[in-house]
Amino acid sequence: MKKLLILVAFVALSFGTFAQSVSESTITKRENRRGMVLKEWNTPAGDKRAFLDRKTTYDEFGRKIEEIEYASYGQKWRVVYEYPANSDITAKVVREIEYNDRDKVVRIRKYEYDEDGSKVRQLNYYPNGKLESVKTFEYVPK
């Protein structure tokens, strides 16, 4: 009986971990991006001065945690990505917070995944927490 309980607990924990897992290629990319800040520069045709177009910040696991898009006047928008507490390199984003050019929250997105780790729902909320819309993902085999 004790072995059965241990087996059930192991299987349950495995499904929780597996649901958040990402592909091997994603893990390799994340390993190469640990603690990185990626800056994208844009140079208009006929101009020699480049301007910062986008900045992406990665955490110690190589997961994207912030992305900022710039315009000539400064920040256009910013998105902060959140992962489950105490998660590791294999975790998928569970929440995004989008800010406008004045750094005010304009939208919050929450994500749900199935046991295979595929995204199944995206819940979009207004800044006040009221549900705006729900996007459902359907995977149709060939």
Where are the language model's segments positioned?
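Sec-dependent N-terminal signal peptides
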Residues: L4-L13
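Sec/Tat signal peptide C-region and signal peptidase I cleavage site
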Residues: F15-A19
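Buried hydrophobic residues that stabilize the cores of well-folded domains
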Residues: Q20-K142
